[in-house]
């Protein structure tokens, strides 16, 4: 570098050093404009995490408590063994939850995917209102949705039971599926679909061999989201369930009406584990 500078004329050397000085000043000024990490941000982050997840950890720990009271007396699996292995009502509620969650999620995924593909592929009147209307069931309070479904079932003379719970879960899951699949379709390349049509593929062939494979990650995430929402729903299920249609959240609610026990902690721990997995 020194040899190169030595061969330059004085005014060029001065210009070179001036340019380096300007670049350094500009770099320092740009560094000041960049967002800096606020002091204590790590502490705030971990405090928020602690606030959100500390109750869950306490619940998980006390589900293994040997005593019925809040005092820790030792580690034990007794509450899992006694209740899970010797309670047919619990297994029936668990079975109802799983059946309704997976079958309702399948139907909601099918209907929501078809709606998303239809709005993405075709133009029709009031198309712009479809996405707006899909947000309404999501922003309405669950108690409003539950009461409206209860009034509807009573109006059409449909007896409350497993069928009404299944219809309700399918209904409130469709908007979530529609939005997730629509977001995936918006990211896909429309020229691939046009190329398939130009090569002679029919509408059904294009749907099942091009569109569905491109949207498959969104469809899978929508299905899992629907299953999770269905498994944990209580409010809507409370309004539309009938005899023989008790789900796991309803079963837990019926137990805590007589006081919280480690059995409730154990059931809640199982639901948390199922949701996470």
Residue ranges and their predicted role:
Residues 43, 50-56, 170, 178-181, ...:
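Transmembrane alpha-helices
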Residues 1-46, 277:
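Transmembrane alpha-helical segments of polytopic membrane transport and secretion proteins
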Residues 54-88, 238-243:
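Short membrane-interfacial helix/loop motifs at transmembrane-helix boundaries
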Residues 23-33, 69-70, 77, 126-127, ...:
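Membrane-interfacial helix termini and adjacent extracytoplasmic/periplasmic loops
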Residues 29-34, 102-134, 151:
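Transmembrane-helix boundary motif in ABC transporter permease subunits
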């Amino acid at each position: 570098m020194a040899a190169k500078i030595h061969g330059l004329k004085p005014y060029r050397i001065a210009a070179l050093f001036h340019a380096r000085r300007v670049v350094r000043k500009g770099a320092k000024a740009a560094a000041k404009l960049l967002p800096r990490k606020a002091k204590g941000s790590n502490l705030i982050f971990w405090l928020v995490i602690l606030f959100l997840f500390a109750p869950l950890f306490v619940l998980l720990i006390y589900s293994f408590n040997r005593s019925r009271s809040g005092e820790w007396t030792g580690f034990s699996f007794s509450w899992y063994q006694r209740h899970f292995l010797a309670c047919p009502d619990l297994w029936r509620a668990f079975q109802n939850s799983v059946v309704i969650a997976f079958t309702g999620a399948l139907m909601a995924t099918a209907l929501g995917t078809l709606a998303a593909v239809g709005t993405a592929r075709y133009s029709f009147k009031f198309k712009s209102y479809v996405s707006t209307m899909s947000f309404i069931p999501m922003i309405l309070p669950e108690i409003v949705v539950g009461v409206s479904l209860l009034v509807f079932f009573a109006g059409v003379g449909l007896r409350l039971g497993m069928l009404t719970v299944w219809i309700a879960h399918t209904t409130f899951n469709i908007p979530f599926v529609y939005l997730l699949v629509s977001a995936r379709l918006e990211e896909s390349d429309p020229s691939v679909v046009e190329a398939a049509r130009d090569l002679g593929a029919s509408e059904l062939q294009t749907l099942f061999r091009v569109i569905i494979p491109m949207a498959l990650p969104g469809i899978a995430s929508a299905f899992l989201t629907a299953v999770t929402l269905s498994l944990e729903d209580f409010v809507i299920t409370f309004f539309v369930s009938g005899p023989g249609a008790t789900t796991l959240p309803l079963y837990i609610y019926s137990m805590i009406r007589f006081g919280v026990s480690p059995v409730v902690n154990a059931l809640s721990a199982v639901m948390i584990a199922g949701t996470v997995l």
